[in-house]
Amino acid sequence: MIEFRNVSKVYPNGTKGLNNINLKIQKGEFVVMVGLSGAGKSTLLRSVNRLHEITEGEIMIEGESITAAKGKRLRRMRRDIGMIFQSFNLVKRSTVLKNVLAGRVGYHSTLRTTLGLFPKEDLELAFQSLKRVNILEKAYARADELSGGQQQRVSIARALAQEAKIILADEPVASLDPLTTKQVLDDLKKINEDFGITTIVNLHSIDLARQYATRIIGLHAGEIVFDGLVEEATDEKFAEIYGDVAQKSELLEVAVK
């Protein structure tokens, strides 16, 4: 379980990114967070593995405080958290296989991984992960030779090879076309269902949130304004999340284009 206890984040310029967040996400959930740009979605997501440090409060993972963790303990906790970014975050000039093997770095010494010395078991796991997202044939291609959708699937394979217990996906389909968007979200959903990996995804599209989530969390101005099951996420609730009905309608139109 991931638990946020009275979590707040204030940026150096005084902007409040999160305001007293109290939230529990159970193991194996597929949670989609929605809200306008600047609502706090990315800040909340990235605070889980401390890419963004919180100002107040505490974040617990399986009963252990990642907020207080340091050194080896922090590295161990981060090893269980896979991160997927809108920008793919791959080493473009490296092969797909090497990018996936990057998910194994946390399990070995710096010297071994720097020299590319991974055991046979890691290679097998990397190949299995690529096969899982239907991109095995690209194992020896350079990452920058792949389409955006293919690169995002490499990111998912990397999280699988990492054997992550939690996957955080920050706007993973924002730059993708509708068909590729479906493929990427289908992959994330199937992995969540097959392996019980807790998955938290930030999305702008209301339509996609309804299609894939088991639970939707709506943020507005750094606060949670909705937290419920998909069937509870009515148009009226989305209007509250996005501020007004006009904004909500505009986003619905974008979602179905």
Swiss-Prot record:
SUPFAM superfamilies: P-loop containing nucleoside triphosphate hydrolases. NCBIfam families: ABC_phnC (TIGR02315). GO terms for molecular function: ABC-type phosphonate transporter activity; ATP binding; ATP hydrolysis activity. It catalyses: phosphonate(out) + ATP + H2O = phosphonate(in) + ADP + phosphate + H(+). Residues 2-246 form the ABC transporter domain. It is found in: Cell membrane. Gene3D superfamilies: P-loop containing nucleotide triphosphate hydrolases. This is Phosphonates import ATP-binding protein PhnC. InterPro entries: AAA+_ATPase, ABC_transporter-like_ATP-bd, ABC_transporter-like_CS, ABC_transpr_PhnC, MetN_ABC_transporter-like, P-loop_NTPase. Its EC number is 7.3.2.2. It is an enzyme of class 7 (translocase). Belongs to the ABC transporter superfamily. Phosphonates importer (TC 3.A.1.9.1) family. ATP binds at residues 35-42.
